Amino acid sequence: MEPEKQTEISEFFLQGLSEKPEHQTLLFTMFLSTYLVTIIGNALIILAIITDSHLHTPMYFFLFNLSLVDTLLSSTTVPKMLANIQAQSRAIPFVGCLTQMYAFHLFGTMDSFLLAVMAIDRFVAIVHPQRYLVLMCSPVCGLLLGASWMITNLQSLIHTCLMAQLTFCAGSEISHFFCDLMPLLKLSGSDTHTNELVIFAFGIVVGTSPFSCILLSYIRIFWTVFKIPSTRGKWKAFSTCGLHLTVVSLSYGTIFAVYLQPTSPSSSQKDKAAALMCGVFIPMLNPFIYSIRNKDMKAALGKLIGKVAVPCPRPEQLLDVYHVPGSLLAARDTEMHPIPYPGGVQSLAGNRDME
């Protein structure tokens, strides 16, 4: 069969995580719960940073952006997966497929760049504490963030434009639960040599640069910390970067565990596992990691929740219900006995000693 032109293709079909009907309810419940926790957790982090002036620092500025990117990354794949499970359909429009691929690589790569920028922030805070406010001023933070968005957007745009030039067979099934770059290339009937070269080039430059930056930053951080004479000083220095190091270990540990293995027929399952961990579960865990041992963040979250919580009524606010004179409320050993009467409910204040 002749492959149809890409412009004539209306949709692809996603293989999903499981084709067994008995698994669909479990998958829907699990990923809906995960997605709701991700949205609520990251939204609380974002609102806490916005509303608490004590968190208006470079470190929390980058954490704000990380929470935003994690929310967008999870929203790229999970809602469509839930919709397909609910509708018992595996179809995704061709344009929607390219859009999903663009967004996933944009936010996924941006996540790595933000982790690298946060490593630079921790490097400056520990190695050059006296110059921290000068080196990490607002223009510098804005420049680091803007450059990261520009590079990641350029990479995703080039991948998407090159993919749009390829031809595919109608009714092709993507061996994944969302539209990813490599599974789409495997379905193309065109020459993908250019695409593969671009993927390799970006993998070397964009893929390894954030990790190299993180690695070099922490080598310098550890070298500086080990020279601190007191154990308390070392612990205090390590505590400022421990949470970030936990997230980095989760992210890159997953990638290394999945891809630094011999190629096997189950490579598509490895791709799914890595995508689930990096695109679904780590964005859900990040708010807990950054708040559970962070006193400043816990205090900000406490203030935020206190503002939105419904306040309990004070005793004097109940006067309109019980019609008790204020002077009696000040008396000791008194209690109120609501009794019915034709017009409604009234109360009498009685002294226990007189009963």
Swiss-Prot record:
Give the bilayer topology. Multi-pass membrane protein
Which GO terms of the cellular component aspect does the record hold?
Answer: plasma membrane
TM segment ranges = 26-49, 58-79, 101-120, 140-158, 196-219, 237-259, 273-292
List the Pfam families: 7tm_4
Q: Where in the cell is it found?
A: Cell membrane
| GO BP terms | signal transduction
Q: Name one GO molecular function term.
A: olfactory receptor activity
Q: Which family does it belong to?
A: Belongs to the G-protein coupled receptor 1 family.
Q: What does this protein do?
A: Odorant receptor.
Task: Write the protein's name.
Answer: Olfactory receptor 1I1
Q: Which organism is it from?
A: Homo sapiens
Question: Gene name on record?
Answer: OR1I1
